[in-house]
Amino acid sequence: MAERIKTGDECAYWDALSSEYQTITRISCGDFHYGPQIPGESRLHLLPPLKAGMTALELGCGAAQNSLWLAKRGIRCTAMDISKNQLAHAKALMRREAVAIDLVHAPIERFHLFCREKRFDLIHSSHALEFVQHPDRILKRIATFLNPGGGVMVSTVHPLYNGSWITGLIEDEDGAVYDGQFLTDYFSPPDDVRDDNGCHAVSRAYPVSAWFAWFRAAGLEVTALAEPKAVRKAPYTSDDWADHGGQLDRVPSTLILVGRCMN
Protein backbone atom coordinates (compact mmCIF):
# COMPACT_ATOMS: atom_id res chain seq x y z
CA MET A 1 0.00 0.00 0.00
CA ALA A 2 1.29 3.45 -0.91
CA GLU A 3 2.46 5.71 1.89
CA ARG A 4 0.01 8.44 2.86
CA ILE A 5 1.24 11.91 1.91
CA LYS A 6 0.98 14.08 5.01
CA THR A 7 0.49 17.84 4.81
CA GLY A 8 2.57 18.46 7.93
CA ASP A 9 5.51 16.53 6.50
CA GLU A 10 5.41 18.48 3.25
CA CYS A 11 5.27 21.79 5.12
CA ALA A 12 8.29 20.96 7.28
CA TYR A 13 10.22 19.69 4.26
CA TRP A 14 9.73 22.86 2.19
CA ASP A 15 10.35 25.18 5.11
CA ALA A 16 13.67 23.43 5.76
CA LEU A 17 14.65 23.26 2.08
CA SER A 18 13.46 26.70 0.98
CA SER A 19 16.64 28.77 1.25
CA GLU A 20 18.84 26.10 -0.33
CA TYR A 21 16.26 25.49 -3.06
CA GLN A 22 15.98 29.16 -4.00
CA THR A 23 19.79 29.45 -4.01
CA ILE A 24 20.64 26.49 -6.23
CA THR A 25 17.53 26.60 -8.43
CA ARG A 26 17.27 29.44 -10.93
CA ILE A 27 13.66 30.27 -11.76
CA SER A 28 13.08 33.26 -13.99
CA CYS A 29 10.38 35.89 -13.55
CA GLY A 30 10.81 36.66 -17.25
CA ASP A 31 8.90 33.62 -18.49
CA PHE A 32 6.14 31.34 -17.21
CA HIS A 33 7.80 28.06 -16.25
CA TYR A 34 6.26 24.59 -16.40
CA GLY A 35 9.01 22.46 -14.94
CA PRO A 36 12.75 21.93 -14.66
CA GLN A 37 14.90 22.23 -17.78
CA ILE A 38 11.97 22.48 -20.23
CA PRO A 39 10.72 25.42 -22.31
CA GLY A 40 8.51 28.07 -20.79
CA GLU A 41 5.38 29.77 -22.10
CA SER A 42 7.40 31.91 -24.52
CA ARG A 43 8.01 28.74 -26.55
CA LEU A 44 5.20 26.37 -25.60
CA HIS A 45 2.23 28.77 -25.85
CA LEU A 46 -0.06 26.60 -23.73
CA LEU A 47 -1.85 29.13 -21.53
CA PRO A 48 -5.30 30.41 -22.48
CA PRO A 49 -5.45 33.97 -23.85
CA LEU A 50 -4.56 36.50 -21.15
CA LYS A 51 -6.10 39.94 -20.75
CA ALA A 52 -5.35 42.67 -18.24
CA GLY A 53 -7.83 42.61 -15.38
CA MET A 54 -8.22 38.84 -15.34
CA THR A 55 -7.84 37.00 -12.03
CA ALA A 56 -5.50 34.08 -11.37
CA LEU A 57 -4.76 31.72 -8.49
CA GLU A 58 -1.48 29.81 -8.14
CA LEU A 59 -1.43 26.72 -5.92
CA GLY A 60 1.91 25.64 -4.47
CA CYS A 61 3.54 28.84 -5.69
CA GLY A 62 6.96 28.57 -4.04
CA ALA A 63 8.51 32.00 -4.59
CA ALA A 64 5.60 32.85 -6.92
CA GLN A 65 7.67 33.51 -10.05
CA ASN A 66 4.78 32.47 -12.30
CA SER A 67 2.33 34.76 -10.53
CA LEU A 68 4.78 37.63 -10.82
CA TRP A 69 5.09 36.98 -14.55
CA LEU A 70 1.31 37.07 -14.88
CA ALA A 71 0.99 40.20 -12.72
CA LYS A 72 3.37 42.05 -15.05
CA ARG A 73 0.76 41.43 -17.74
CA GLY A 74 -2.02 43.00 -15.76
CA ILE A 75 -3.43 39.83 -14.21
CA ARG A 76 -4.69 40.19 -10.63
CA CYS A 77 -2.89 37.32 -8.90
CA THR A 78 -3.29 35.34 -5.71
CA ALA A 79 -0.45 32.94 -4.89
CA MET A 80 -0.64 30.30 -2.18
CA ASP A 81 1.97 28.03 -0.61
CA ILE A 82 2.26 25.70 2.36
CA SER A 83 5.72 27.04 3.31
CA LYS A 84 6.09 30.37 5.07
CA ASN A 85 9.76 30.38 4.11
CA GLN A 86 8.94 30.00 0.43
CA LEU A 87 6.51 32.91 0.76
CA ALA A 88 9.26 35.02 2.35
CA HIS A 89 11.23 34.54 -0.87
CA ALA A 90 8.11 35.50 -2.81
CA LYS A 91 7.84 38.76 -0.86
CA ALA A 92 11.47 39.56 -1.63
CA LEU A 93 10.86 38.94 -5.34
CA MET A 94 7.77 41.16 -5.24
CA ARG A 95 9.92 44.02 -4.01
CA ARG A 96 12.62 43.33 -6.59
CA GLU A 97 10.17 43.07 -9.48
CA ALA A 98 8.02 45.98 -8.24
CA VAL A 99 4.84 43.98 -8.75
CA ALA A 100 2.06 43.35 -6.23
CA ILE A 101 0.32 40.00 -5.76
CA ASP A 102 -1.72 38.59 -2.88
CA LEU A 103 0.22 35.93 -0.96
CA VAL A 104 -1.59 33.33 1.16
CA HIS A 105 0.01 30.87 3.58
CA ALA A 106 -2.05 27.70 3.26
CA PRO A 107 -1.83 24.10 2.02
CA ILE A 108 -3.33 23.25 -1.35
CA GLU A 109 -5.83 20.94 0.33
CA ARG A 110 -7.40 23.96 2.08
CA PHE A 111 -7.20 26.59 -0.63
CA HIS A 112 -10.99 26.82 -0.79
CA LEU A 113 -11.17 28.10 2.79
CA PHE A 114 -9.21 31.21 1.78
CA CYS A 115 -11.08 31.87 -1.47
CA ARG A 116 -14.70 31.39 -0.45
CA GLU A 117 -16.10 34.41 -2.29
CA LYS A 118 -13.57 34.49 -5.12
CA ARG A 119 -13.67 33.08 -8.63
CA PHE A 120 -10.78 33.01 -11.06
CA ASP A 121 -10.16 33.16 -14.78
CA LEU A 122 -7.06 30.98 -14.43
CA ILE A 123 -5.94 28.52 -11.75
CA HIS A 124 -2.44 27.16 -12.24
CA SER A 125 -0.02 24.89 -10.41
CA SER A 126 3.51 23.95 -11.47
CA HIS A 127 4.98 20.81 -9.89
CA ALA A 128 2.98 21.01 -6.67
CA LEU A 129 0.06 18.58 -6.96
CA GLU A 130 2.41 15.59 -6.82
CA PHE A 131 2.91 16.51 -3.15
CA VAL A 132 -0.77 16.11 -2.15
CA GLN A 133 -2.62 12.93 -1.21
CA HIS A 134 -5.65 13.31 -3.49
CA PRO A 135 -4.95 15.45 -6.58
CA ASP A 136 -8.18 14.22 -8.17
CA ARG A 137 -10.19 15.81 -5.37
CA ILE A 138 -8.22 19.03 -5.68
CA LEU A 139 -9.04 19.23 -9.39
CA LYS A 140 -12.76 18.85 -8.72
CA ARG A 141 -12.58 21.66 -6.19
CA ILE A 142 -10.51 23.83 -8.53
CA ALA A 143 -13.24 23.58 -11.17
CA THR A 144 -15.80 25.08 -8.78
CA PHE A 145 -13.65 28.20 -8.34
CA LEU A 146 -13.42 29.04 -12.04
CA ASN A 147 -15.33 31.74 -13.81
CA PRO A 148 -17.35 30.48 -16.81
CA GLY A 149 -14.86 29.54 -19.50
CA GLY A 150 -11.98 29.79 -17.04
CA GLY A 151 -8.78 27.84 -17.54
CA VAL A 152 -6.66 25.41 -15.52
CA MET A 153 -2.99 24.57 -16.00
CA VAL A 154 -1.35 21.74 -14.08
CA SER A 155 2.21 20.59 -14.57
CA THR A 156 3.41 17.62 -12.58
CA VAL A 157 6.04 14.91 -12.51
CA HIS A 158 5.80 12.60 -15.51
CA PRO A 159 5.21 8.94 -14.55
CA LEU A 160 8.18 7.80 -16.64
CA TYR A 161 10.51 10.10 -14.73
CA ASN A 162 10.00 8.20 -11.47
CA GLY A 163 11.72 5.19 -12.95
CA SER A 164 15.45 4.55 -12.68
CA TRP A 165 18.03 5.47 -15.30
CA ILE A 166 20.24 2.44 -15.87
CA THR A 167 23.53 2.41 -17.75
CA GLY A 168 23.96 -0.53 -20.10
CA LEU A 169 20.30 -1.49 -19.84
CA ILE A 170 19.97 -3.00 -23.33
CA GLU A 171 22.40 -4.83 -25.61
CA ASP A 172 21.38 -5.29 -29.24
CA GLU A 173 22.27 -8.14 -31.59
CA ASP A 174 25.43 -6.34 -32.68
CA GLY A 175 26.67 -6.02 -29.12
CA ALA A 176 25.98 -2.30 -28.82
CA VAL A 177 24.94 -1.29 -25.31
CA TYR A 178 22.33 1.38 -24.59
CA ASP A 179 21.26 3.27 -21.51
CA GLY A 180 17.60 3.64 -20.67
CA GLN A 181 14.86 4.22 -18.15
CA PHE A 182 13.54 1.26 -16.18
CA LEU A 183 10.06 1.48 -14.67
CA THR A 184 8.70 -1.43 -12.67
CA ASP A 185 5.05 -0.41 -13.05
CA TYR A 186 3.79 2.43 -15.25
CA PHE A 187 0.31 2.32 -13.69
CA SER A 188 1.70 2.67 -10.18
CA PRO A 189 5.10 4.37 -10.50
CA PRO A 190 7.44 4.31 -7.50
CA ASP A 191 7.24 7.32 -5.22
CA ASP A 192 10.02 9.89 -5.10
CA VAL A 193 10.69 9.75 -1.36
CA ARG A 194 12.83 12.56 0.02
CA ASP A 195 14.53 12.56 3.40
CA ASP A 196 16.58 15.74 3.78
CA ASN A 197 17.43 18.09 6.64
CA GLY A 198 15.69 15.76 9.06
CA CYS A 199 12.43 16.08 7.10
CA HIS A 200 10.39 13.67 5.01
CA ALA A 201 8.39 14.29 1.83
CA VAL A 202 6.79 12.23 -0.90
CA SER A 203 6.27 13.15 -4.56
CA ARG A 204 3.86 10.84 -6.39
CA ALA A 205 3.42 10.34 -10.12
CA TYR A 206 0.34 9.01 -11.90
CA PRO A 207 -0.32 7.71 -15.42
CA VAL A 208 -1.15 10.28 -18.08
CA SER A 209 -4.57 8.66 -18.52
CA ALA A 210 -5.34 9.19 -14.82
CA TRP A 211 -4.73 12.93 -15.08
CA PHE A 212 -6.80 13.13 -18.25
CA ALA A 213 -9.67 11.28 -16.54
CA TRP A 214 -9.46 13.52 -13.47
CA PHE A 215 -9.74 16.64 -15.63
CA ARG A 216 -12.81 15.21 -17.35
CA ALA A 217 -14.38 14.11 -14.07
CA ALA A 218 -13.97 17.67 -12.78
CA GLY A 219 -15.92 19.00 -15.76
CA LEU A 220 -12.81 20.32 -17.50
CA GLU A 221 -12.21 20.01 -21.21
CA VAL A 222 -8.55 19.17 -21.86
CA THR A 223 -7.35 21.68 -24.46
CA ALA A 224 -3.63 20.88 -24.40
CA LEU A 225 -1.34 18.10 -23.22
CA ALA A 226 2.44 18.28 -23.45
CA GLU A 227 5.51 16.21 -22.49
CA PRO A 228 8.33 18.61 -23.43
CA LYS A 229 11.90 17.58 -24.10
CA ALA A 230 14.68 19.35 -22.25
CA VAL A 231 16.26 22.49 -23.65
CA ARG A 232 19.64 24.06 -22.92
CA LYS A 233 18.22 27.41 -21.83
CA ALA A 234 15.19 26.99 -19.58
CA PRO A 235 13.36 29.40 -17.26
CA TYR A 236 13.61 26.80 -14.46
CA THR A 237 17.05 25.24 -14.10
CA SER A 238 19.94 24.38 -11.80
CA ASP A 239 23.43 23.00 -12.32
CA ASP A 240 22.15 19.48 -11.62
CA TRP A 241 19.15 19.77 -13.95
CA ALA A 242 21.30 21.24 -16.72
CA ASP A 243 23.80 18.39 -16.35
CA HIS A 244 21.23 15.67 -17.11
CA GLY A 245 23.54 13.87 -19.51
CA GLY A 246 20.91 13.53 -22.22
CA GLN A 247 18.42 11.66 -20.05
CA LEU A 248 15.78 14.40 -20.33
CA ASP A 249 16.16 14.35 -24.11
CA ARG A 250 14.81 10.80 -24.08
CA VAL A 251 12.48 10.66 -21.07
CA PRO A 252 10.11 13.53 -20.14
CA SER A 253 10.34 14.85 -16.61
CA THR A 254 7.15 16.91 -16.74
CA LEU A 255 3.56 16.31 -17.80
CA ILE A 256 1.47 19.40 -18.61
CA LEU A 257 -2.30 19.54 -18.94
CA VAL A 258 -4.37 22.60 -19.74
CA GLY A 259 -8.13 22.58 -19.39
CA ARG A 260 -11.16 24.80 -19.68
CA CYS A 261 -14.32 24.95 -17.61
CA MET A 262 -17.12 23.41 -19.67
CA ASN A 263 -19.95 24.91 -17.59
For each feature predicted by the language model, list its residue ranges.
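A conserved beta-strand element that flanks and buttresses the S-adenosyl-L-methionine
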Residues: 124
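C-terminal lobe and adjacent flexible extensions of AdoMet/dcAdoMet transferase-like proteins
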Residues: 214-263
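Conserved class I S-adenosyl-L-methionine
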Residues: 1-52, 65, 69, 93, 151-189, ...
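Acceptor-substrate binding/catalytic loop of class I
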Residues: 156, 160-164, 195-210
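A short glycine-rich, Lys/Arg-flanked "PGG" loop and its adjoining helix->strand segment in the class I
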Residues: 136-151
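Class I SAM-dependent methyltransferase SAM/SAH-binding core
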Residues: 57-59, 63-111
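Short alpha-helix
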Residues: 191, 202-225
